[in-house]
Curated annotation (Swiss-Prot):
Biased composition (Basic residues): 52-66
Single GO cellular component term: nucleus
Record-linked PANTHER family: DNA-BINDING PROTEIN S1FA1-RELATED, DNA-BINDING PROTEIN S1FA2
Highest taxon of source: Eukaryota
BP GO annotations: regulation of DNA-templated transcription
Family: Belongs to the S1FA transcription factor family.
Residue ranges annotated as motif Nuclear localization signal: 50-55
Organism: Oryza sativa subsp. japonica
Sequence segments annotated as region (Disordered): 52-76
Matches recorded under Pfam families: S1FA
Single GO MF descriptor: DNA binding
Protein name, as recorded: DNA-binding protein S1FA1
Amino acid sequence: MADQSNNMIIEEVNKGLNPGTIVLLVVATLLILFFVGNYALYMYAQKTLPPRKKKPVSKKKLKREKLKQGVSAPGE
């Protein structure tokens, strides 16, 4: 390309990384580290924590379930 003074405009070759690329790499790296860390904590918790206790089923719910199945509830 030539401008008005007949000088050639030389496009500079971009050496190094684009700032947008650097930001993208940093964000992607942080996301990957976050998910890997969460997975590691999850696996550690699965090995070390005792299993969760189930909530006790209320007598009212037991009675309702037995009535649905056709079995008479005790005391009736």
